[in-house]
Amino acid sequence: MNKIKLLPLMMALSSVAIAETAPITEVPVEQAMPTITVNAPAVEQTIPAAIPPAQDGVLPQLSFEAQQTRAAELSQRADYAYEQEQLRQEQARKLAEAEQQIQQTVGNNVLLLSSTTAKIYLDNDFTPMWNDHAAVRQFLKEYAAFAASGVSPKSAKALQQILNQPEGLAKDILLTDSFLDYLYYNKNVYRNANNWLYNLGSYSPKSPSEEQIASWVKSVKNGSSGQFVANLVPRNHIYQETVQRLFTMSPGASTSTKKATKGKSKNVATTSADEVATTGSSSFYKLALNAQRLRIIPSFNNGIFVNIPSYQLYYLRDGQLALQSKVIVGREDRRTPVMYSKLSNVVVNPPWNVPTSILTKDIVPKLARNPGIADSLSYEILDGSGNKVNPRSVNWSQYVNAKSVPYRIRQKAGEDSALGRYKFNMPSSDAIYLHDTPNHGLFSRTDRALSSGCVRVNKSSELASILLREAGWSAEKQQSVLASKKTTSVNIRSDNPVYLYYVTSWVEGGKVHTLPDIYKLDSNIPKTSISWNKVKSVI
């Protein structure tokens, strides 16, 4: 018998001679193999002389021949782990060298995503990625509009580095590094809009997914990188018009704005219909920031659009205006959130389950002063088991400053209900929806930031009629159900996306429009140091 082949077996047997019968315990690679420390340019390696055999509770129970097979399997497994660790260490060494090489190439310029950028050039033999000049111009136009918005000061500095860098591999590397930043932003801004676009300073450049990078590299290799970059541009025509206007301006400059007129708007989705828009000027930076806020809307073609500071709802079908209505939105301390959802159903004669925040902040203090309002407002007080409770039997004063109350309140359906006659549901983690209101007199006010977050619709009856008609309801059935005061829910058949967004400055039809910044979200916009004339010269 070959003694060399028996050596691993003998080592394995000796290592488990005292092992108890137990499930197999595999030692992680990190324990089985000391790691290699890479300090570019010198690379120190600590490699073991031999790999300790893994303890195996199964081995002592096997026959001698089975033990041989088992020991061989363990040895092969250890060899494979060793080879994989060697490969990983070699890849890490090459990547560290590549990262050092690209940093030396770009000199004092700061890379946003140096490791990911280095890997791209390492995998592609350091060949230039930006030979398509049309792709360069298209990318720089979009990246400049993003950088000017103040969303990412680091991106603005990265753009300026590109503008200052002469042609060559260094500029190519800077372009790739910034493009990775743009890829990540463009892909993720939709789900992070509330933070990135309305809480300036929260965005941080990160690497895009490997799939995105692979798709872009593939387009570079097959000569279609220009089309790849062009496909990243939002199709929203108002976004495109707004960005285009930026390149006719200079930072620090203002542009004249158009005052909205009364009556039905001929423009789409964003213009106020009751003199909400203001005259004056819109700064370069404000316009740049609001252009980014328009990115979250694919197009103004189908769906319900509510630009929160305009106090208007627009319902579009195939690009045509089906309904325009005044709305009431959340007040400053209970803001209507920026969000995207879809209408799921219409509720006729909806009851109102009072949210906890409104219960504790608004209703409990009123009940403490006068429990009788529960009867006048058709409130039902329910305990934790759902049993009705006499409002006069509760000492409401003890809950005036409490964060929670051991009761729920439900308001019965009816014209006097806080939700009015119709509720338009949409899946939302914020419990935000559209609804009617019993107090239509408030729609005559100019400032309509009055609700607790939901959107009250002046023409809710007309909106419900459109949606119910599509569900097969006649006008007679609609009126009959309303009169019955019976709560009825009807699923919506058509696809109706809902966009709640916040834009205070934009360009539409060649005109700049502005709205009051009702939530103070345009204050303290960072003024980036970008050579805008250089930007305009390269795009």
What is each PLM-predicted segment?
Residues 2, 27-80, 200, 218-539:
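Well-ordered beta-sheet/strand-loop patches within structured domains
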Residues 190, 213-216:
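A sensor for short, sequence-defined functional sites
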Residues 11-13, 91, 121, 137-144, ...:
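Generic hydrophobic, helix-prone segments enriched in Leu/Val/Ile
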Residues 99-106, 137-146, 206, 387, ...:
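Phosphate-binding glycine-rich loops and adjacent basic patches that engage nucleotide phosphates
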Residues 16, 179, 424:
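A residue-level signal for conserved active-site and pocket-lining positions in enzyme catalytic cores
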Residues 1-20:
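Gram-negative bacterial Sec-dependent N-terminal signal peptides
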Residues 21-202:
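Cationic-aromatic interfacial patches
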